[in-house]
Amino acid sequence: MNIIKNFLQKESASGILIILAMILALILANNGVLNKFYSEILRLDSGIIFGEFKLIKPTILWVNDGLMAIFFFFIGLELKYEFLEGELNSISKVALPSIAGIGGVIVPAVIFYVLNHANRFDVNGWAIPTVSDTAFALAVLFLLGSRIPISLKLFLLSLAIIDDVAAIIIIAIFYTKTLSIISLFISFCAIVILTILNYKNNQNIYIYLLCGIVLWVSVLMSGIHATLAGIIASMFIPLRDEDGDPEHGMLQSVMHFLHPIVAFLILPIFAFSNAGVVFSEDSILNLTHPVPLGIIFGLFIGKQIGVFSFAFLAIKCKLAELPNGCGWLHLYGLSILTGVGMSMSLFIDGLAYAESDAFLYANKIAILLASTMCAVTGYFVLRKASKSQN
């Protein structure tokens, strides 16, 4: 329980740090003098040259393709542990977050599609309102302190894991470009080596690190989004140590090492790099376009309806139970909080419209607006739920 408590505390602190990073990005982007400095940082090219091999990218892509690969590697480690040893290691435990998570993907996607189906390019962003930012949601929960049952926080974490699985599948299937056969072959070779290492329960972290780097570069060059390399590599990190103990295995060690790096460095840097919205007259007027509207309605309306209605049906059909100590109002308030998309929605937005900046600032404003609405509304609903319970 102490491990979970520490985890939650770090996640909430990370959410606050992400908010500060986004505020700083907004200040820089909307200041006439500092905007140029901010833009030049994001466009600055850097990379590696080794003989004929060159890997040169601007800062923004190093963040989105590199640092976010580490983020997804960490998420993959969490998924593996939770499905094998943790909160999702049985059907009864996984039922409610799984069913609620499915609703939280389907309903927002349908709302976005209904508003944008007339234009084949616009509809590419259907996945933007389907994801959640757990760090932000946990930060809101912790503002309420001990008034919120620990079971509700654990349910949010379980729901976040299901949400991450959905995001991984969506990125792999719908946001992958043309493929390079040679790079895919190198990726396959790296995966084979990782499989052998895992089968033999090899405990040398440096071999896994080397294979992971080769896998990341080859996936990046293949046309598949590089963040998937992180997920793939994480699946091969040994769960148990040489004595068969999962609590002291490499997976737990790497998770504990990466957690503060992801929470306090990678996610704030990502937020700072992607949240620099210029509040121009055009970007404000473009909020009435179906794409930004689809994002706003998908996150604020679709998420809460999808998560709550699917969870409600699952409980009424005896497929799952309400978290201990929670009432329906708790569940509804949490459902609203899942609409806080922030960093993950910004990430999917960058993939969906990578070849165009037609909705660049309007989409970011829509994500910020909808996420803020969800955070504020969810906070007051949960506050009322805690008072009603007392």
Swiss-Prot record:
| InterPro entries per UniProt | Na/H_antiporter_dom_sf, NhaA
Membrane topology of the entry: Multi-pass membrane protein
Per the record, the GO terms for biological process are: regulation of pH
Reading the lineage from the top rank, the first entry is Bacteria
Gene3D superfamilies in UniProt: Na+/H+ antiporter like domain (1.20.1530.10)
Write out the GO cellular component annotations.
plasma membrane
Q: GO: which molecular function terms?
A: sodium:proton antiporter activity
According to its UniProt record, where is this protein located? Cell inner membrane
Per the record, the major location class is membrane
Query: Membrane spanning segments where?
Result: 14-34, 59-79, 94-114, 125-145, 154-174, 179-199, 205-225, 260-280, 295-315, 328-348, 362-382
What keywords is this UniProt entry annotated with?
Answer: Antiport, Cell inner membrane, Cell membrane, Ion transport, Membrane, Sodium, Sodium transport, Transmembrane, Transmembrane helix, Transport
Catalysed reaction per UniProt? Answer: Na(+)(in) + 2 H(+)(out) = Na(+)(out) + 2 H(+)(in)
Q: Which family does it belong to?
A: Belongs to the NhaA Na(+)/H(+) (TC 2.A.33) antiporter family.
Q: What biological function has been recorded for the protein in this entry? A: Na(+)/H(+) antiporter that extrudes sodium in exchange for external protons.
Name this protein carries in UniProt: Na(+)/H(+) antiporter NhaA 1
